Curated annotation (Swiss-Prot):
<keyword id="KW-1003">Cell membrane</keyword>
<comment type="function">
    <text>NDH-1 shuttles electrons from NADH, via FMN and iron-sulfur (Fe-S) centers, to quinones in the respiratory chain. The immediate electron acceptor for the enzyme in this species is believed to be ubiquinone. Couples the redox reaction to proton translocation (for every two electrons transferred, four hydrogen ions are translocated across the cytoplasmic membrane), and thus conserves the redox energy in a proton gradient.</text>
</comment>
<keyword id="KW-0830">Ubiquinone</keyword>
<keyword id="KW-0411">Iron-sulfur</keyword>
<feature type="binding site">
    <location>
        <position position="69"/>
    </location>
    <ligand>
        <name>[4Fe-4S] cluster 1</name>
    </ligand>
</feature>
<feature type="binding site">
    <location>
        <position position="108"/>
    </location>
    <ligand>
        <name>[4Fe-4S] cluster 2</name>
    </ligand>
</feature>
<feature type="binding site">
    <location>
        <position position="63"/>
    </location>
    <ligand>
        <name>[4Fe-4S] cluster 1</name>
    </ligand>
</feature>
<keyword id="KW-0479">Metal-binding</keyword>
<dbReference type="GO" id="GO:0048038">
    <property type="term" value="F:quinone binding"/>
</dbReference>
<comment type="similarity">
    <text>Belongs to the complex I 23 kDa subunit family.</text>
</comment>
<keyword id="KW-0472">Membrane</keyword>
<dbReference type="InterPro" id="IPR017900">
    <property type="entry name" value="4Fe4S_Fe_S_CS"/>
</dbReference>
<keyword id="KW-0997">Cell inner membrane</keyword>
<dbReference type="GO" id="GO:0051539">
    <property type="term" value="F:4 iron, 4 sulfur cluster binding"/>
</dbReference>
<feature type="binding site">
    <location>
        <position position="112"/>
    </location>
    <ligand>
        <name>[4Fe-4S] cluster 1</name>
    </ligand>
</feature>
<dbReference type="InterPro" id="IPR010226">
    <property type="entry name" value="NADH_quinone_OxRdtase_chainI"/>
</dbReference>
<dbReference type="GO" id="GO:0050136">
    <property type="term" value="F:NADH:ubiquinone reductase (non-electrogenic) activity"/>
</dbReference>
Amino acid sequence: MRRITHFFGSLFLVELLRGMMLTGRHLFARKVTVQFPEEKTPQSPRFRGLHALRRYPNGEERCIACKLCEAVCPALAITIDSEQRADGTRRTTRYDIDLTKCIFCGFCEESCPVDSIVETRILEYHGEQRGDLIYTKPMLLAIGDKYEAQIAQDRAQDAKYR
């Protein structure tokens, strides 16, 4: 009996019709492709994009040159030099991030005890040469100053999960 059923099923091309029905169902379904430069998907507050260095509200930079971010970076993309100030505190003289090495893992952000280094929602940035993708301390501070409101809002939304 099974052979007869199989014979008539293959004779009338039932499998072919089932496959075409499945294809037709997906043909008229809603498309999931996003045309990226024109359309943008919403980003999470935890999005890991371009790095920024933050300042305190009084204008002083947050980084205390503990070098935890440099130590924890698996790609060795962060370079920090520091020196002692007259008041005994240690501050950075050089803070470079090489974005050609960076894998945007977020370990630097997690290890920072004073919330100095953060990853922003900035996704689109480019460089004409390799050297353009090495971000220095003044560049990172400028990004932090420009996007501080958005960074603070994202940190506040994420605070209950940290």
